[in-house]
Amino acid sequence: MEQNLNSEQKPQSSAKPRGKSSRSTILAQTVKTGIIKSNLIPMWAGLTLGMYKNKMTFIDNIPEMIFSTVGSALVIGAAGAFNNVYDRDIDAIMPRTQSRPTVTGEMSAKSTLSLAIVMLIIGLAVLALASPLAAAFGLLGVFLYVVPYTMWTKRRTIYNTEIGSISGAVPPLIGWSAVSTDITHPAIARFIFVMVIWQMPHFYAIAIRKRVDYEAASVPMLPVVKGMRRTYYQTNFYLILLILSSFLFGSLSVGIMLVALLLSIAWLVMSIYGYHSNKDQVKWATKMFVFSLFHMTILFTTVIVYSLVGVIFKLY
């Protein structure tokens, strides 16, 4: 990491020159606002679920909702910025990441690192206003994403996806711990398990779509090292596991369980049918990726709505 930070020379890139980006665009690319938004959904699911299961009121927890949202956005953005600093050498090789400010030179590594540190400190302070435990999980999430995933496993093993899925499951814990210290409650434990499983076929789809990029950058993603067939079988394994894990929601709500079950079955059917009927593997993977986002958004939004209705109308 030290070698990466001290080298301020712009990595060689085959990207075509482009016009100067606005400051807002540069900032958005640096902190990865798309990832921030997508991670706030499960954070809110964990938050509202925690309020519901612990029989809390909406009004009394407005400060915690604000602090956990702002704090989570900041620490997730910090993690993205740290990742941009460390990965800028391979980002310069892959077309999908060549426009990142740390590659184009619009943001230096030192400036990006400084931004990440400031965002992390402020984000943790804001999360601490919700609860010290939420801040602790925020720090844990950043650590897991930056060190075990980005620095240790991403460039070394095909199991980088499994390691990355652990950090990806932290946002619901941040939300839950903002309002409750009972982190062993079955509701959040089951939610975290589903979150970990969901990430596997999601990131396998990304790896297939960008297989050429990862291969060029020598990133050992599963389809690069083991090929498409192994990735397809492993994707289906996790989708079957996701179907089975849908029943974990049964004790919370039959409705949520059915939503999770139907979405997961549809995803598996799409995987099997799409793989065998479509010779274009990238096109198949793109559909799988899009559906994974649909799956997450619908399922977690259902959890949020169910929990909020229960909290507002006190349906404990």
Curated annotation (Swiss-Prot):
UniProt cross-references to NCBIfam families, sorted A to Z: cyoE_ctaB
One Pfam assignment: UbiA
Subunit structure: Interacts with CtaA.
Family annotation (PANTHER family): PROTOHEME IX FARNESYLTRANSFERASE, MITOCHONDRIAL
Enzymatic class: transferase
GO CC terms: plasma membrane
GO molecular function list: protoheme IX farnesyltransferase activity
Location in or out of the cell: Cell membrane
Pathway: Porphyrin-containing compound metabolism; heme O biosynthesis; heme O from protoheme: step 1/1
Catalytic reactions of this protein: heme b + (2E,6E)-farnesyl diphosphate + H2O = Fe(II)-heme o + diphosphate
A GO BP annotation: heme O biosynthetic process
Task of the protein: Converts heme B (protoheme IX) to heme O by substitution of the vinyl group on carbon 2 of heme B porphyrin ring with a hydroxyethyl farnesyl side group.
Topological category with respect to the lipid bilayer: Multi-pass membrane protein
Region span, Disordered: 1-24
Main location per the UniProt record: membrane
Membrane-spanning parts: 62-82, 117-137, 163-183, 188-208, 231-251, 252-272, 293-313
Known EC number: 2.5.1.141
Family to which this protein belongs: Belongs to the UbiA prenyltransferase family. Protoheme IX farnesyltransferase subfamily.
Encoding gene per record: ctaB2
Protein name as annotated: Protoheme IX farnesyltransferase 2
Misc. comment: Carbon 2 of the heme B porphyrin ring is defined according to the Fischer nomenclature.
Top-level division of the source organism's lineage: Bacteria
Keyword annotations of the record: Cell membrane, Heme biosynthesis, Membrane, Transferase, Transmembrane, Transmembrane helix
Feature: compositional bias, Polar residues: 1-15
